[in-house]
Swiss-Prot record:
The gene is gatC. Keywords: ATP-binding, Ligase, Nucleotide-binding, Protein biosynthesis. It is an enzyme of class 6 (ligase). Signal peptide: none annotated. InterPro entries: Asp/Glu-ADT_sf_sub_c (IPR036113), GatC (IPR003837). It comes from the Bacteria. It comes from Rickettsia felis (strain ATCC VR-1525 / URRWXCal2) (Rickettsia azadi). Pfam families: GatC (PF02686). This is Aspartyl/glutamyl-tRNA(Asn/Gln) amidotransferase subunit C. Belongs to the GatC family. The keyword Acetylation does not apply. Its EC number is 6.3.5.-. One of its GO terms (molecular function) is asparaginyl-tRNA synthase (glutamine-hydrolyzing) activity. PANTHER family: GLUTAMYL-TRNA(GLN) AMIDOTRANSFERASE SUBUNIT C, MITOCHONDRIAL.
Length: 100
């Protein structure tokens, strides 16, 4: 069981501030979490191989090939409307004002 003082110390280390009644609730919640951890620590996992992937499939990796990465011209070809030419020149998307 985590005491009220221990809960206050943990809260201070985490830079949290609690009201007096909230510290007791925090203490109870931490105690519950620590009890769950104790239960997990009791499980014997010595003969269990660690799971590294949920899929047993072999993932084919593609070769790392350097290609031209300047796609801005293609991207700005899709811009339409009155501001299309300006957007292509400055390479920014021009949108209507959203926030006043």
């Amino acid at each position: 069981m985590i005491t009220k003082e221990e809960a206050q110390k943990i809260a201070k280390l985490a830079r949290l501030k609690f009201e007096e009644d909230t510290v007791e609730k925090f203490s109870a919640q931490l105690s519950t979490i620590m009890n769950m951890i104790d239960i997990l620590n009791e499980i014997d996992c010595k003969d269990i191989e660690p799971l590294t992937s949920v899929s047993n499939m072999n993932v084919r990796m593609r070769e790392d090939v350097v290609t031209s990465s300047d796609l801005s011209n293609k991207l700005f070809d899709n811009v339409s409307g009155n501001s299309a030419q300006l957007a292509k020149e400055v390479k920014y998307f021009i949108t209507p004002k959203v926030i006043e």
